[in-house]
Amino acid sequence: MTTRDGVWVVAACFNEEAVIVRFIERVLAVPGVDHLVLIDDGSGDATLDQIRIFLSQRRSLGVPVPLTLLELTRNFGKEAAMLAGLDYVRERCAAAVLIDSDLQHPPELIEAMVAEWRAGAEVVTAVRDDRDQESRLKVLSASWFYRVFNKVVDSIQLQEGAGDFRLLDAPVVEAFTQLRESSRFSKGLLPWTGYRSVELPYQRVSRVGGSTSWSPLKLIGYAFDGIFSFSVLPLKVWTGLGVLVSGLSLLYALVIALRTALVGPDLPGYASLMVAVLFLGGIQLIGIGVLGDYIGRIYVESKARPHYFIRSIDQG
């Protein structure tokens, strides 16, 4: 078994050619950082080349570089890339720091995170205290997501503004990497492990290069992944709605029966009949969709496919 030693920084990279060299230099300049692990998640630009050129230049100068590059065979997604990095450092590090490679997470904050860890923290979570650079719609939608998630999920509570920028003690890394589910939601999985967390506020800066790969649809899908991964309340909601609609239907049938007995039958109401049929049909289709989402997740989990494949490992 490899000896666990030092603080290892883990960062997934996807199309970050404009900033990746600056990111490497800033991370390695932080006091307390012992090693940097970059995971190229199938980048389509020159990200991989930029990292290899950096390594080659340092080697030609005879300068040792505490940097390891994991090249995945394709784009498996950020969650899988982070897991690949943590799998690699699991038996090598005393603590691991998860950080984005686009420089919106300030690498200099790692020094304060390490200080909290050395003081006894098991998890150090960087929490955004400023969202002025984002649109009003994005701020409101994010706030709505956290409120809904914390209401429908009993086992954990998410801290608004907390993302993937965290320091994890070695036992936390070990526990987290044991969770091998396919639909991963790290923001929820890390609190679910139950380790105590210390929070550090920070201000997220604008991107200095490149563009985000997270579209609004991807963000919405990620939000639903989080809720469906940690709660069966959507199933219970549709069960309750079915009971409610059935109860109202029986009540309405009773009203019609009494009215017919007292004043005679009404003329056929085609409009009201169509409204009722379409309403019930819509309810049924939505309910089937919710049920299908859960069944689909069971199907994906049952195949137990690996989360990623590594093409090459390049150590500096």
Question: Model-predicted segments: where are they?
Answer:
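Structured catalytic core of nucleotide-sugar glycosyltransferases
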Residues: 1-135
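Hydrophobic helical membrane-anchoring modules
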Residues: 1-3, 185-316
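A generic fold-level signal
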Residues: 2-4, 64, 91, 160, ...
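Short conserved micro-motifs on helix faces and helix-strand junctions that flank
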Residues: 5, 12, 72-74, 166, ...
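Residue-level signature of catalytic and energy-coupling elements of molecular machines
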Residues: 27, 85, 102, 124, ...
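Acceptor/aglycone-binding surface of glycosyltransferases and processive sugar-polymer synthases
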Residues: 66-74, 78-88, 107-186, 205-224
